[in-house]
Amino acid sequence: MTAAVAALAVMGWVRAPGEGHASRPQARHLQMGKGEAYPYQSGGFTRFVSDSYREADGGQTADFYAWMDKACLQSNLCAPGSGQMLAMIDARRDALGAIASPKQRAQAEMALAATLHHWIKSSMPIFSLQEGFEFSNVAKHRERQCLLQSVLLASLLQEADIDAGVVMVNKNAGGQTSNNGHCVALLKLSDGTDVLVDASDRQPFVRHQGLFAKDAVLKNYRYVEPVFQGDTPIIVSYQSPDHAVKIPDRPLRPLDTDFLRSQFDFYRGERTSGGLLDAHPTDNGLAREAHYLRSSVHACPQNPLPVYMLGRVEWRRTHTGEARRQLSRAARLYQEAGWVPSGLRAAQHDAHMAFSAPSPSPA
């Protein structure tokens, strides 16, 4: 047994060689909002995986789970004799459940998140914008992308009874804005604070400055800016992008599964060969991209990004009326969420539309 595995075994986070598997409890103490839960190997998480394999040529969800178990064992994250990712996570859940102090449990939650952050980066070393959002490509090519890695990390943490999910990033740690151009995991720790975990960064905990998340009180999506504790990555509260409204951290929730399914289809459309981002868009490519974007909008009509991109694609296809309709709808969604990207103004200008939303931030 390696020193690393021995240390984890002492902490109760993996089982030492020869130990049997504890039976999994039937009830989970973690209470999450509607549509927020997708713990590892649950029906909610497996749907993400099966959707991916449906898009792939061959393979099945069992291939992904088999790869995960093998990679867990090869990395020494799973102790010899257990060999299953699920068993490892369940052992850590049991250890977390024995911690009475919210502060100490929060520290242990962050330690597990950091361990999984390292494991994902080392086991899936290839970051691919083109294909890394498909779970089928984890097993085939060891690829990942920001949405996939964040959903996977959140699912593993949820299985350990940690309140975790995914949020979009519209302003990174350096202050650069984008149109929801990145995804990270959000951990709502037991001591009442939050942290962001980004498997695209060398360090597990990051200080991104603008997020797109779910407001549990208003029941809608909104843009917020985290308020950090000094120079640490600990989030103590949130505020609106104009700093006019202070938002307690508890009502701010991760994005729901409808939104996440929508976002997977958005990336499938965005990365379609011959689509809008291609150097040489084709009629067939644009039609296929529009198909995925419509599927994305259908999964979550309140996700503004696919609505915006659908408007741009339809404009390129010379479907002028439909393009204007989608761009107008996107403008309303962004405005309601509290932030408008400058790219929307440019798209509406190209479509000869009057821009009625507030002045956008650069993106």
What are these regions (language model features)?
Residues D51-V138:
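Secondary-structure boundary elements
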